[in-house]
Amino acid sequence: MAKKSKKNQQNYWDEEFEEDAAQNEEISATPTPNPESSAGADDTSREASASAEGAEAIEGDFMSTLKQSKKKQEKKVIEEKKDGKPILKSKKEKEKEKKEKEKQKKKEQAARKKAQQQAQKEKNKELNKQNVEKAAAEKAAAEKSQKSKGESDKPSASAKKPAKKVPAGLAALRRQLELKKQLEEQEKLEREEEERLEKEEEERLANEEKMKEEAKAAKKEKEKAKREKRKAEGKLLTRKQKEEKKLLERRRAALLSSGNVKVAGLAKKDGEENKPKKVVYSKKKKRTTQENASEAIKSDSKKDSEVVPDDELKESEDVLIDDWENLALGDDDEEGTNEETQESTASHENEDQNQGEEEEEGEEEEEEEEERAHVHEVAKSTPAATPAATPTPSSASPNKKDLRSPICCILGHVDTGKTKLLDKIRQTNVQGGEAGGITQQIGATYFPIDAIKAKTKVMAEYEKQTFDVPGLLVIDTPGHESFSNLRSRGSSLCNIAILVIDIMHGLEQQTIESIKLLRDRKAPFVVALNKIDRLYDWKAIPNNSFRDSFAKQSRAVQEEFQSRYSKIQLELAEQGLNSELYFQNKNMSKYVSIVPTSAVTGEGVPDLLWLLLELTQKRMSKQLMYLSHVEATILEVKVVEGFGTTIDVILSNGYLREGDRIVLCGMNGPIVTNIRALLTPQPLRELRLKSEYVHHKEVKAALGVKIAANDLEKAVSGSRLLVVGPEDDEDELMDDVMDDLTGLLDSVDTTGKGVVVQASTLGSLEALLDFLKDMKIPVMSIGLGPVYKRDVMKASTMLEKAPEYAVMLCFDVKVDKEAEQYAEQEGIKIFNADVIYHLFDSFTAYQEKLLEERRKDFLDYAIFPCVLQTLQIINKRGPMIIGVDVLEGTLRVGTPICAVKTDPTTKERQTLILGKVISLEINHQPVQEVKKGQTAAGVAVRLEDPSGQQPIWGRHVDENDTLYSLVSRRSIDTLKDKAFRDQVARSDWLLLKKLKVVFGIE
């Protein structure tokens, strides 16, 4: 709330005050201008420029790399625009561009309309002016001619008779009538002009509509001609014809398979051996999954070939191949036909009109089929890490066949039991190191489906179980870092997250932070309500399902659980989340599922595993589709004995092979290197033990793997890893991988004022920058990895510009000893923390401390405005004590009070200083400040003047004189400073504006 009020109060003074501030810059030199300072101005400016140059030189490494890559990117965009090449943009960039274009368009339209209206007004004015002048000239000419005619006709009479004088009232009435007539004429002209413009606009719109219609008709004609041509060639097929063709093919296949029909081409000639005919394809290419399936079935049928007579062998095999091809064709076209049948609501009369559209749809379907076949080819061409099971006819659909393991992260507050819960899940089915058990990978634990089946067996009586995925991959390191590192172009590679909440404490600060992070990434998650064993008198049943355990608890335990659960449900609702216990949740998409668990007894863990699989399999099958395209993220950079610097990578899609050329993000630019070794630890061994690693020639997603390669020292944790393919351009991939980092520069303040931010990984740096942006804290420079002396030197440039920002915010990084000493020597504050909000608290406390010191230093110059009325003079002198009422503003202890009088002879303004407020009393009770309306009976004020030259009551000052606080240019500037700005109310700023006139302040 304090932040909000601060923000609102920043605009309390008007432009006039800002102009004042511009004249006397900041209060940093408030006390008295030092004559030496002006003399040494050149020296300071030289020093400042030198420090700026130093900052640029220091910038080195990370920041300069980012700037270079951003410049390169901008240059590339300009070149592409010049060449006229299509520019690939992200969805966000497109939306931003669209909005900007719309804004610009609206601005241009408004400007055009305004200009037209202005021009029309000017034109009308000119026309009216001309008409009035013309009318006046004609009238004057008519009067003149009439006068001259009259004079020539009766010269003697006119000489004798003087002209009759017109009464003043009549003349005024005539003038009014003339003016009215002129106005009517002007209005008439304006109306005519408006009507003309409206008519022109209508005509223009009608013409545009006509042109559109003509263009549409021409396009239709063109399409019709094209359709006729295709029809003449016999290439055009309607939906109905396509369906008929497919139906005929299926019937033919059915007839052949029945064996009642003999086809001449299939009959064997005399003397021909009973060998199965080899299937010859028109193009030599790699086999698709359907062909492999047919091969498998062929091999099965071969086993039973002894029973089948020789003369039927060839026929049966050929028919089988035919049948499988048709089945594959039917499967491929199934989606298309379903869509077609849904859309074909139009009658037969409209068939001819829709033929062109049908043809296009048919072509699109063919392209999709080819693309699908290509994906299958690529997937098959790379051999699998584990032997795949032989597909059965029922599992021929691709969406169930190629699902990969879902990737899961664990988040939550400190000490909620994240690590313990993970250990419990990991330890559940380790059966004496047997094969097929849970395997510990680099940075992740892999649970094969057999282990999950064994663990979730207790759920069978409550829920229906399906197991379509090969397993579950759980990221080992719990917390924000691992989650925020698993990202790809803003969207998370983590498929599902577990948010752990302590049932005893509810939502805590870091839990709320985790919810925000999950919301930003749009990641689905479930809530694990941990520590249910802490409920008083809970009877534990190890590794049981929650529902079974809960049903066996006493009534008191059930009631306590219900009350605590309701409280947490309410807290989640405050964060904008609807939640429900997972087995009572009827709408999984709108309500967050809550699973009560115990990391100690293992109760609720089967429920959690079942829910994770249920959600990922049913709702995320598209995201879990296995693709051959490599998607990998660097989790950590580590030094390993015997391998040098290695990177821990989560491979979420595709294959990685030994010898692959990889591109990744580095501190000093992109790193291009070859994979020397792909390593995973020995099964069921702790990573901390120096065990032998298992070498692999290739690995398949999804898993965690350690990569050993050259030049990995400067690799950035949290960045993407790309593989250079045979058709890829290495330079393009290098630019592409650095694009992730260039976005960080948008968070850096362009004014050059702000704090220096250092983080351990890319994900945590992004999270910290977002947090600082929300808190309105400017950032001058960013960095990754440990803090060294050169990083502290960047922050030292702030000592002159803005001392309150001479701070380093370090998130989860080590600080070098030399850097610490240098920071202490220069007076730079380094804050290091593992939790973002701890950093923020430390920084705000430090800023508040600095402001408090500043307030003490400039308290004498901070004079708050007030207007007083004298009620009673208690003591005239030594000390002067008077009773006053506060008419406006705030009266504080230490405020100098004066009266302003005008000299009757010289008419000059005189300021009579009564003294400084020493103490204030209301009803004999001392107070520090009194505001307007705070007291009705007045306040007793004791005034003392150090000079001893106080004015005398009755002679210099009387009770009718208004008293003011003695404000000056310096006091106004002091109140504008950050240290006092929050304490000055809006009414006080308005009063200051009035007092500036009273005291004649420029």
From Swiss-Prot:
Positions modified as Phosphoserine? Answer: S405
| Cofactor field | Na(+); K(+)
Report biased composition (Polar residues) as residue ranges.
27-37
Which InterPro entries does this UniProt record tie to the protein? EFTU-type, P-loop_NTPase, Small_GTP-bd, T_Tr_GTP-bd_dom, TIF_IF2, TIF_IF2_dom3, TIF_IF2_dom3_sf, Transl_B-barrel_sf
**EC number in record:** 3.6.5.3
Q: Which residues bind K(+)?
A: D415, G437
Q: Name one GO molecular function term.
A: small ribosomal subunit rRNA binding
One Pfam annotation, family name?
IF-2
User: What does the function comment of this entry state?
Assistant: Plays a role in translation initiation. Translational GTPase that catalyzes the joining of the 40S and 60S subunits to form the 80S initiation complex with the initiator methionine-tRNA in the P-site base paired to the start codon. GTP binding and hydrolysis induces conformational changes in the enzyme that renders it active for productive interactions with the ribosome. The release of the enzyme after formation of the initiation complex is a prerequisite to form elongation-competent ribosomes. Stimulates 20S pre-rRNA cleavage to mature 18S rRNA by PIN-domain endonuclease NOB1.
List the PANTHER family hit by this protein, alphabetically: EUKARYOTIC TRANSLATION INITIATION FACTOR 5B, TRANSLATION INITIATION FACTOR IF-2-RELATED
Question: What family is reported?
Answer: Belongs to the TRAFAC class translation factor GTPase superfamily. Classic translation factor GTPase family. IF-2 subfamily.
Which protein, by its recorded name, is this? Eukaryotic translation initiation factor 5B
Q: Which organism is it from?
A: Saccharomyces cerevisiae (strain ATCC 204508 / S288c)
Task: Give the gene that encodes this protein.
Answer: FUN12
